[in-house]
Amino acid sequence: MDYTFYKDLYFDLKNFTDEQLKTHYHKYGSWEGRICNKEMMQYKINKNKIISNNKNSYINNYIPKTTPKKINILIRTSNRPNCFSHNIDSILKQNYHNLNLFISYDNDFTKEYILNQLNDKNLNFKIIQVKSNNNQYHYNDYCNHLLKEVNDGYIIFLDDDDKFNHDNALKYINDYLTDDIFLVWDYFRADKIIGPKKGQIKKGNITSCGFCYNSKYKSFWPSEINADYTFINNLLKNNNLKVGKLNKILTSSINLNTIYGQGKREDI
């Protein structure tokens, strides 16, 4: 077991001693599918790439069956131009034209690289200024500002550290979009594949970029841990929505060498 690796990979373990890390892994981490060294990480990544390729092979030559519906992609980015570049590249590869991007920025540097990367691209986009604060989870509120900009169509969140995992992902998603369905799929993270089983959404088995829904349904992102689950749970509870599951791995982390979304803000 590599104690430094284990602690660096999982934000909730950052203050643990080596002895505490050892105890945690044997009592909880191994059962939760956590990774405790680089060799195990590479094994998991290679295994999950095979699973992803097999699951997604059906849509390699996918021919859409329905007219492209309007999809709004909401992106939070801050001080990560390289991540953002990979994120946008995965959107461009979709070749899906009924698309709007809403992108938040909280400083001038971020605004500059957004505009530099998008101004020569054939994309409909709008940038929205947001303000950071001292709350540890203030970035969740950025989603609320982005949501206010959407007037119609469907919504997908795709932060700057995430990307589409297949070039036909949006075409495939579009064919299953209906007003009363909250559509979910699987997500490829560094240490595991995440997604609800049989459409049963629970804390820890859903990610912010693992679903799509009609924008007429409303919910709110709280500034707290597991805000994506809270947002989804309230959305489903307060609206007459059914959960639909696509058995495909349609989004993934941009960097499979770490786990983002746990207070980690480094670029690639």
What kind of feature is each model-predicted range?
Residues 44-90:
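N-proximal low-complexity "stem/linker" segments adjacent to membrane-targeting elements
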Residues 1-49:
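Charge-rich, low-complexity intrinsically disordered regions
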Residues 183-196:
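Short beta-strand-to-loop element that shapes/binds the nucleotide-sugar donor at the catalytic cleft/hinge
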Residues 200-267:
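Conserved nucleotide-sugar donor-binding catalytic segment
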Residues 133-150:
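Glycine-rich, basic loop-to-helix element that forms the pyrophosphate-binding segment
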Residues 153-163:
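Short beta-strand-to-loop acidic/aromatic patch adjacent to the donor-nucleotide binding site
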